[in-house]
Amino acid sequence: MIGFAITALGFGAGLVGYLLLRRSGTGWRVGRLLAAAPERSLAQAAALAADGEPGYVRLHGRIDSDEEFPGDDGKPLVYRRRRLQGRRGRGGWATFDDQRLAVPFRLSEKGEQVGIDTEALGDGLVVVPRESEGVAGDLTSDAVSGKLPEMPPETPVRLRIEQVSAVDHATAAGVPRIGEGGAVVLGAGLGRPLVLTTLDLDEAMRVLAGGRRTELLVATGLLVATPVIMVIGLIALAAGL
């Protein structure tokens, strides 16, 4: 029957789209949250926190901190994540050493301030990373914070550094709440991670897509088309086609 074939096609399109998104890792979810979160001012975020009404919102402001630390290039930083990763066949990169250094910082705009929960900031950080690659045989014991893992010396490894400068502007998505001392803090919540990027949204999406931008576009198209195809199939079935 034509209706059954169309319905099966819709189901198949949805399945393929879902599998393509799964292959892209967490990037697609972070990008979707960043794009879909309603934009609010810092003052509005403070009001949400004061009312005790949890809401996942997107904020923008200038990064501000009373403490900073120097980066390798001398630029003042408020957050740095340094990861060593090993290649696992076609499964991508697996992290075996993860070091983070952060100081308290906040978003500021027009006299308003909202702090960032640095403890919650992880895979939701979207910046242009600094990367260098080599092989496991080049690593020394002081390259990692703990014990150097055992792996074949020819295993590809890479150093990935992501950092946030004290002179940047940033966009962040999360749930505002009242923290210690009555200050407003933006963090994870409602089952969603804290997201922060120092890039404009279009560039952030490109970084999240990485080399899988075409796959993500195809997956999005398939998922958008799936309900349309399914409805057409059900109509055809109802019509006896």
Task: Show the residue positions of the predicted features.
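OB-fold and OB-like single-stranded nucleic-acid-recognition modules
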Residues: 1-241
